[in-house]
């Protein structure tokens, strides 16, 4: 399964490059891929980015086969492995990804943060992952990016593109124009050249059904957040792992602190279950997310799916 995922990613990068390539002249007999835009890789549920130490032990992109980012970079591709909340909702992750790319403070939005009773602002990225993204270069060409998401990372990048393209009417209505994040004002859909999703559960995840059938949904969510809260205020926070749950006060901002009392924060985040990746991966949550998302006709879209499920005995569900 891991080998299939690696092969699919390499094929995706090659296909994106060729699809976005300006046609060579008829006299050219040798074809060479041209990569003018960076590739941003976004992990899925319980995943991690290139900045976390666990990635040096087990690269998320590449796993036991080695670091795929290094491999692609050695082939001439400009690649980055972003880090977003492994348990966060598609909305929160899109906000975190935007801030990381731009080098600004994470803004979850006035309306959204009020609806789900958490802080509006998260951490600040003092250096943009992609300098001059969305600006014109010296030749007057817009500096764009390619987005590649695995599993729930695919939902994350689709949400990011939707907000870049259309913005958020709710956030624009709730926020002073002088104070609103550029993510919520729209008009930036052309900042993205392509969107590629790999094994993304666009219409819910099959793992949802056996968990619900066995009555484990609440327990799984509790254990996930309890573990995140412990690790997110330990010496491993911001180094080995990073859960990005400071908006709920459950984890500390690396190097800053600021987490709320543990059990208070744990109750807080569990009281807002619908603002989580676990909810967005349910049939109900996926339907709500999909209603928000549209296709930008000026962006190339690729989606790769694999059938590697096995039937679970007794309940008969494919997982």
Tell what function each PLM region has:
Residues 27-148, 152-200, 204-219:
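N-terminal non-catalytic accessory region
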Residues 22-26:
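Sec/Tat signal peptide C-region and signal peptidase I cleavage site
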Residues 11-19:
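Hydrophobic core
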Residues 4-12:
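Sec-dependent signal peptide recognition
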Residues 162-163, 167-319:
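Helical cap/lid subdomain of alpha/beta-hydrolase-fold lipid enzymes
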């Amino acid at each position: 399964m891991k080998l299939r995922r690696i092969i699919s990613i390499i094929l995706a990068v090659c296909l994106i490059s060729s699809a976005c390539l300006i046609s060579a002249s008829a006299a050219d007999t040798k074809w060479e891929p041209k990569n003018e835009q960076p590739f941003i890789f976004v992990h899925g549920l319980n995943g991690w980015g290139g900045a976390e130490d666990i990635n040096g032990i087990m690269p998320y992109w590449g796993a036991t086969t080695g670091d795929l980012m290094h491999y692609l970079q050695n082939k001439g591709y400009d690649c980055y492995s972003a880090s977003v909340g492994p348990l966060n909702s598609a909305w929160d992750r899109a906000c975190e990804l935007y801030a990381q790319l731009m080098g600004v403070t994470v803004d979850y939005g006035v309306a959204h943060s009020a609806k789900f009773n958490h802080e509006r602002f998260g951490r600040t990225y003092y250096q943009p992952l992609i300098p001059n993204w969305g600006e014109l270069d010296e030749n007057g060409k817009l500096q764009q990016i390619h987005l590649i998401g695995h599993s729930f990372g695919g939902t994350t990048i689709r949400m990011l593109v939707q907000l870049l393209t259309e913005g958020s009417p709710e956030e624009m209505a709730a926020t002073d124009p002088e104070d609103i994040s550029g993510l919520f004002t729209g008009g930036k859909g052309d900042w993205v050249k392509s969107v590629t999703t790999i094994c993304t559960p666009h219409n819910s995840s099959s793992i949802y059904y056996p968990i619900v059938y066995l009555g484990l949904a609440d327990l799984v969510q509790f254990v996930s957040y309890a573990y995140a809260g412990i690790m997110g205020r330990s010496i491993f926070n911001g180094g080995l792992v990073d859960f990005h749950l400071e908006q709920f006060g459950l984890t500390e901002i690396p190097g800053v602190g600021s987490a709320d009392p543990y059990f208070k924060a744990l109750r807080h985040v569990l009281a807002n279950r619908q603002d989580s990746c676990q909810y967005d991966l349910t049939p109900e949550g996926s339907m709500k997310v999909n209603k928000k998302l549209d296709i930008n006709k000026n962006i190339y879209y690729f989606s790769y799916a694999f059938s590697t499920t096995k039937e679970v005995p007794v309940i008969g569900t494919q997982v």
